[in-house]
């Protein structure tokens, strides 16, 4: 009898942990919608970038987040710390600033960027440019795939004869970030 009570307690703890983590199986992929993205209202959410480092326990939350403003548009924010401000001169002050604005087309649980505007702090002001107008970028694609409370970004590019792929993981949170944090 005690054996079954222990097993039940362990299973209950596992179910609670999975529910708390917002885990979903791959066959639970959601079609992209305002509620899935957390556009507004009771479902309002933010997507925090996740960076896992080998050999370190826990998950590190990187210095960026995405806020979807509609089913087909998003704003991406980047956190600038004191070194970014004083040494690198990348921002006017410490905090989050708009990094990119993205327009998407949607299909199932994927969003594919059709237009990307990025910002750069130059000579004391923010300058906005379009990916398509960049002389260094010959081709690019940016796709987000959503599975439950997780999202994967894949950015593929060709620039001056070099090409590459960058992948970033995100998790959905309900509080607007005020600074990078660790879990």
Listing of model-derived features with the role each one plays in the protein:
Residues 2-4, 16-45, 170-183:
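Bacterial Sec-dependent N-terminal signal peptides
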Residues 11, 28, 36-38, 43, ...:
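Intrinsically disordered, low-complexity serine/threonine-rich segments
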Residues 35, 45-50, 54-67:
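Low-complexity, Ser/Thr/Pro-rich intrinsically disordered segments found in N-terminal tails, propeptides
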Residues 52-55, 75-152, 159, 171:
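Contiguous, well-ordered beta-strand patches that form the walls/edges
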């Amino acid at each position: 009898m005690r054996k079954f009570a222990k097993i039940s307690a362990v299973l209950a703890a596992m179910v609670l942990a999975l529910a708390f983590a917002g885990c979903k199986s791959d066959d639970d992929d959601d079609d992209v919608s305002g509620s899935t993205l957390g556009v507004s209202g009771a479902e309002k959410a933010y997507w925090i970038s996740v960076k896992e480092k080998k050999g370190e326990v826990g998950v590190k939350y990187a210095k960026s987040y995405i806020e979807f403003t509609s089913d087909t548009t998003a704003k991406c924010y980047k956190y600038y710390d004191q070194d970014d401000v004083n040494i690198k001169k990348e921002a006017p002050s410490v905090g989050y600033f708009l990094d990119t604005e993205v327009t998407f087309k949607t299909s199932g649980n994927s969003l594919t960027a059709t237009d990307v505007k990025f910002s750069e702090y130059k000579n004391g002001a923010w300058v906005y440019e379009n990916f398509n107008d960049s002389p260094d970028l010959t081709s690019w694609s940016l796709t987000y795939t959503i599975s439950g409370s997780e999202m994967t970004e894949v950015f593929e590019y060709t620039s001056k004869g070099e090409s590459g792929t960058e992948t970033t993981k995100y998790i959905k949170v309900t509080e607007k970030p005020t600074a990078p944090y660790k879990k």
